[in-house]
Regions:
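Hydrophobic h-region of N-terminal signal peptides that target proteins for export
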Residues: 12-21
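A mid-sequence, solvent-exposed acidic-amphipathic segment
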Residues: 148-186
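Terminal connector regions
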Residues: 98-144, 149, 218-244
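Beta-sheet-dominated interaction scaffolds and their linkers
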Residues: 21-47, 151-166, 200
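Buried hydrophobic-core signal for structured, non-transmembrane domains
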Residues: 40-46, 95, 110-115, 164-171, ...
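Intrinsically disordered, low-complexity Pro/Gly/Ser/Thr-rich segments with frequent PxxP/GP/PP motifs
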Residues: 68-100, 191-219
Length: 244
């Protein structure tokens, strides 16, 4: 999987001067590790016209009461930690597990953080030109699977007081679930309700989430089919909507 990253960070909204964006290509956009696969590589391509100095660091990705928290970790080895990518060139970053996770009961989650380091001449150059250099700051998820993977997503439908249909999911497995889109197909009326581009919908083991589907529709009890696009591909779940 490949995506083109056009850096337009929040600083761009706060600065009145022009913003110089940098283009990077990253592959893959998520890293999977485990007891039998304890090493991986990430390719970073500079699609811009100037060299880029990047710093790579691994951090632990945790979540408390729905709030993401990043903490230092020594569980992962990152090599090289600092590097320069010339225009049109590719840099390989290697990741490795420092500790074995064979006894882990559930998935461990980390992030590979890539930060751009300003070149020494940037400050003087941009001060003269009146431009603001927005530095790259990327976070790629790194998932370390347990020895035995158990996936168990539990879906149900409910109707809110305003008539909106809500899909509820709980992750009873021991690895994450990433949701991209939802579509609910009514087998009787052929209507389709959807929730598109669910930003940040990564459910860790033990987490639950409610997702409102649109548009509001007078759906019957069913049968309905919930089409869920996840990072493991599409899933189709047969559901009914409880009567009021």
């Amino acid at each position: 999987m490949r995506f083109m990253l056009h850096t337009a960070l929040r600083l761009a909204l706060m600065m009145p001067a022009a913003v110089i964006a940098a283009d990077l290509g990253i592959m893959p956009v998520a890293v999977q590790l485990g007891p039998q696969h304890d090493r991986a590589t990430v390719q970073i391509v500079n699609h811009g016209t100037t060299p880029m100095i990047l710093q790579a660091e691994a951090i632990a990705w945790q979540r408390h009461n729905g709030v993401d928290r990043d903490t230092p970790t020594s569980d992962l080895i990152v090599n090289p930690p600092v590097f320069t990518v010339q225009p049109g060139r590719t840099q390989i970053v290697r990741l490795g597990l420092r500790r074995a996770s064979a006894e882990a009961a559930k998935e461990s989650t980390y992030r590979l953080v890539l930060r751009e380091v300003p070149a020494p001449q940037d400050a003087e150059t941009h001060a003269v030109q009146g431009n603001v250099r927005v530095l790259v700051a990327l976070r790629l998820p790194v998932y370390v699977a347990p020895a035995v993977v158990a996936r168990d997503e539990r879906w149900q439908l409910r109707r809110q007081a305003d008539g909106a249909v809500v899909a509820e999911v709980s992750n009873a497995g021991n690895v994450h679930l990433k949701i991209a889109t939802l579509r609910l197909h009514d087998g009787v009326t052929a209507q389709t309700l959807s929730a598109e581009a669910i930003v940040g919908a990564v459910l860790f083991p033990g987490e639950a989430r409610s997702i409102q589907l649109k548009p509001n529709a007078a759906l019957g009890s069913g049968p309905h089919t919930l089409e869920v696009l996840t990072d493991r591909g599409p899933q189709y779940v047969a559901l009914s909507l409880p009567s009021d």
